[in-house]
Amino acid sequence: MSRIKVIFFDAAGTLFHVKGSVADIYLAHAEKYGVKRTPDLADSLRNAFARAFADAPPPVFAVSDPKEIKRCERLWWFDVVHNVWYRVGMFERFDDYFDDVFDAFGGPSYWAMYPDTPGVLRGLKEQGYELGIISNFDSRLFNVLRGLGIADLFDTITISSLAHAAKPAPKIFQLALDKHAMDPDDAVHVGDSRRDDVEGARKAGLQAVLIERESQIGSSASNIPVIQTLEQLPALLAAL
């Protein structure tokens, strides 16, 4: 029988995903401000977002006041989105455009759960596991989870801006463990990033499971437990 008592999950890319693509949503909003859609622009936006997001610093801020944290989160994303459009072509009224996009991603409209998410989470709760989220998402995550109808399935939610640490730093994992009064050996973390989720969790002493939803053959790294759907998780837990 598994000794695991608490299961942590990454959020976006693990439990839910963007409907369509970020680039398509950015472009749809930009059309309201006079930007003309072309296939080349859509491709350029996809590449620009990938680079801008990868180049962004960790979303960790030296403030503690909730209002200041939200302000910093918004500025962090402003820099990312500005960087995207700086690469492909800026347009007038960008500040208004950014407000529209940022607020739109703050609810469930542009997010969709993976089909296996709610059933697996409820099943794990019924088996007695404690569930938590460890994510580099910002504080909009709470509203997204409520909108998707799964917020009440989690005992804790730990995000980087409130934890003052971002994955893969061990600190954010330890803070999440402390909320459950658990030791690292009692926990497993499930996520879609080798660096942030697997390496980060292991450095903090947790076991880790990589979810590769787009993969059909699994991971080439035999020392990493890999699943393609959350439905495979319960059987894997029994072996941990």
State each model region's role.
Residues 1-7, 17, 36, 40-43, ...:
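Asp-based, Mg2+/Mn2+-dependent phosphohydrolase catalytic module
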Residues 2-119, 126-127:
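N-terminal helical cap/lid subdomain that shapes the substrate entry/recognition surface
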